[in-house]
């Protein structure tokens, strides 16, 4: 049974209790598919998919179907023809915590259900201001903070998707050049489900925010010390991959020694990523519909689900 207290807005599940909620849902991914979805440093395997993500997929599927029925009932009451309203999911969490892998897994799992086969995934990276703008406004050291995003454009994008526009576009971002890709866009054409993944998607404010348009949200959580270690480990590995690609923004880091790279990564973490986590990202955790809590092994060991 889930642990529940009147004082908490959440139901708490240990891993054994949560995995039982998979019920009879079959495994729909292969080891090769999981390998392709896994991010650098992640340890997700078929067992993690079966015990954590299949139950989550089942929960979201049930909520999508319930929302579809509610929308149909409302339109019938109003005497309107059926309308297509995408179900919007937000996925939030710190850099290096594994939220991108979580979002990719959810996309693949959710599109296997017959009632919502079209699932689009968009990251908020595309709504960062271009590097030239960030430099001009002194925001390069604040990249990833709320003010470094074009929040109006992001809000307009989600609103347009939610309202059922036939075609909506999102800018593309390159992690190699560390900048927006000029003239390139991701097309979103009336999906059944839209997954929006990013650091600050659960932010609130005095006016309408994208989080107000979410039907469900996931926060990927872990101890700060563990996230720091994962960030540094990932940085060290990137010296041999992305940092060596043509046009890489961080090419100067590629030939650093382990000691030099460790010092550089820790400085970036301490000066940029950690303050952003503490000031902006972590405070939004309480708004999530569900929290996936990872242990030091980078695998989920607890799940917290908001009471409905």
From Swiss-Prot:
One term under GO cellular component: cytoplasm
One BP term from GO: coenzyme A biosynthetic process
Pathway assignment: Cofactor biosynthesis; coenzyme A biosynthesis; CoA from (R)-pantothenate: step 1/5
Cited InterPro entries: P-loop_NTPase (IPR027417), PanK (IPR004566), PRK/URK (IPR006083)
Residues that, per the record, bind ATP: 93-100
Class of this enzyme: transferase
This enzyme's EC code(s): 2.7.1.33
Secretion signal, residue range per the UniProt entry: none
Domain of life: Bacteria
Keywords: ATP-binding, Coenzyme A biosynthesis, Cytoplasm, Kinase, Nucleotide-binding, Transferase
Primary site of residence: cytoplasm
A single MF term (Gene Ontology): pantothenate kinase activity
Subcellular location: Cytoplasm
One Pfam family here: PRK
Family: Belongs to the prokaryotic pantothenate kinase family.
Protein name: Pantothenate kinase
Organism: Corynebacterium aurimucosum (strain ATCC 700975 / DSM 44827 / CIP 107346 / CN-1)
